[in-house]
Regions:
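Acidic/polar residues at beta-strand termini and the immediately following turn/coil
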Residues: 103-105, 278, 342
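Generic detection of long, well-ordered alpha-helical segments
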Residues: 4, 51, 58, 62, ...
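Short secondary-structure junctions and interdomain/linker hinges
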Residues: 5, 17, 21, 25-28, ...
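Aromatic-lined, polymer-binding surfaces characteristic
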Residues: 110-122, 126-321, 325-337, 344
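Boundary detector for helix-to-coil junctions that initiate low-complexity/charged tails
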Residues: 1-14
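Short, flexible loop/turn elements at secondary-structure junctions
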Residues: 104, 139-142, 423-425, 438
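Extended, charge-enriched "interface" segments that sit outside catalytic cores
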Residues: 17-123, 130-135
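Carbohydrate-active enzyme catalytic cores, enriched for enzymes
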Residues: 282, 286-465
Length: 465
């Protein structure tokens, strides 16, 4: 263990001891009277979509993409009944009153204790933490807020606000399973920031709620800032945490602390794209799912940085474009991505799709962001996530791009050990990926012992997996 890691772990242990002692006192104290509110104007001005265009968006979507509204309403109606799709379990019913500590699949309730006192690796008493974590990412809330934004139906806004308020009430700072993982906190913060954007016109978005949600967002980002996933096979965990710090710090900019979050997030994102993305643009863990996961986080940060004139290191854009080139080539003729390595079933941004069985929305956004006609060809259509990330003008840019078939039917990724061949770029063509790489990251990560295997897709179906 290097000296730097020893110092980091000793410092973390000291912080935990202080926080554990302070936690009981903190729970008894009232919230500070000067808790920050949402600076609605500045938040909206920095968001992905500008205040000038947001008012016209619902009518534009109704005229241009009415199917998006129909889908949003159908899902929002189910969410108002506390029914949602969760991982591979299908629809789960959260009950009349949502208990954010109860596993929605097994019904087992996780105990309330200091956040660092859970042993998720060795103690299986309460089951798999993945399901409770997935629920508490609250990635369904932006889709509920989106339905309100597109329809003006107030009950969707009220439901989203009620769920956030109930989460805050049930999860005091530092207590419970939902404070255990900095990555899960980071994804929840990103979900809340999108939800806030969609709900800003709602009468239910009161000053009292604004203060409460900002207290919680600040506490959660403060936690991520204190306890990033360093020296623990972090990889995509650290990328996700850095994205939340950067996005949250940039959107809420106004204090020394928010600028600290922004700058730390930016430094980590720049560092980790060099550490984790190989020379050929493939993520080091050699998992197609986690590759898309990392690309999705970087796209969120890169687009918001461009929107706000934040000067990222130039290698960020180049590496993200490389990552999308891998996605373009590895995507099969049916639009799906072969499942190489682990897949946890989650997603970094879930405004539309909830998994990475395909990542055509990333290619759609990449076509607009980088002016890539071949990305447009493979994305097949303008995707909803591109609209929310890049705004209405992205529709015009995408439409003006020619859809140009990629130049080659073969692409080698030698650093990763992937060799992709295809007979063409139509839906009936054959597509094969040879895996000649290693296990992935030095600690194994999400790679599999699958060297010299291959996946074959032909005639519209899997032949070898």
């Amino acid at each position: 263990m290097p000296a730097r890691e020893i110092a980091f772990r000793l410092r973390e242990r000291a912080m935990l001891a202080i926080e554990r002692a302070w936690n009981g006192l903190r729970a008894a104290e009232p919230p500070p009277a000067d808790a920050p509110s949402v600076a609605l104007d500045s938040f909206a001005a920095r968001f992905y979509i500008s205040p000038q265009e947001r008012q016209a968006l619902p009518a534009f979507v109704q005229a241009t993409f009415p199917e998006w509204i129909a889908k949003a309403v159908e899902e929002a109606d189910a969410l108002c009944d506390h029914r949602l799709q969760l991982l591979g379990y299908g629809t789960v019913d959260l009950g009349l009153e949502i208990d954010w500590h109860r596993d929605p699949v097994t019904g087992v309730e996780w105990p309330r204790r200091f956040w660092a006192d859970y042993d998720l690796v060795n103690d299986g008493t309460y089951g798999d933490s993945k399901t409770i974590h997935e629920l508490n990412r609250q990635q369904h809330l932006p889709r509920l807020g989106k339905a309100y934004f597109l329809t003006g139906e107030e009950r969707y806004a009220v439901e989203a606000i009620d769920q956030i308020a109930s989460w805050i009430a049930q999860n005091p700072e530092g207590v419970g399973i939902n404070w255990h993982s900095s990555l899960e906190i980071a994804i929840r913060v990103l979900s809340w920031l999108w939800t806030i954007f969609f709900l800003l016109p709602s009468p239910a978005f009161t000053e009292q709620f604004a203060r409460g949600v900002m207290q919680s967002v600040s506490a959660q980002l403060r936690h991520v800032c204190r306890y990033p996933s360093l020296y623990s096979s972090p990889n995509t965990h650290l990328i996700g945490e850095a994205t939340a710090l950067f996005v949250g710090g940039l959107l809420l900019d106004g204090t020394a602390e928010t600028r600290k979050w922004r700058d730390l997030g930016a430094r980590l994102l720049v560092r980790e794209i060099g550490n984790q993305i190989l020379d050929d643009g493939v993520h080091c863990e050699l998992s197609t799912s986690y590759h898309c996961y990392a690309a999705d986080f970087y796209m969120q940060a890169l687009i918001l940085a461009h929107r706000n004139g934040f000067d990222f290191a130039p290698e960020i854009a180049g590496k993200v474009e490389q990552m999308l080139e891998f996605v373009m080539h590895v995507t099969r003729p049916d639009g799906a991505i072969p499942q190489l390595g682990d897949d946890d079933g989650g997603r970094a941004l879930a405004l539309d799709r909830q998994d990475y069985h395909c990542y055509l929305d990333g290619l759609s956004s990449g076509a607009v962001l980088f002016g890539r006609a071949d990305f447009k060809w493979q994305s097949r259509a303008f995707r909803e996530e591109t609209f929310w990330l890049l705004g209405r003008d992205a529709c015009t840019v995408y439409a003006a791009l020619p859809a140009t078939c990629p130049e080659t039917n073969r692409r080698d990724f030698p650093s990763a050990g992937y060799f992709v061949h295809r007979t063409g770029w139509t839906e009936r063509d054959t597509h094969v990926v040879f895996d000649c790489g290693g296990l992935g990251a030095p600690t194994g990560g999400h790679g599999h012992a699958d060297a010299l295997s291959l996946v074959l897709f032909s005639g519209g179906r899997d032949l070898l997996i």
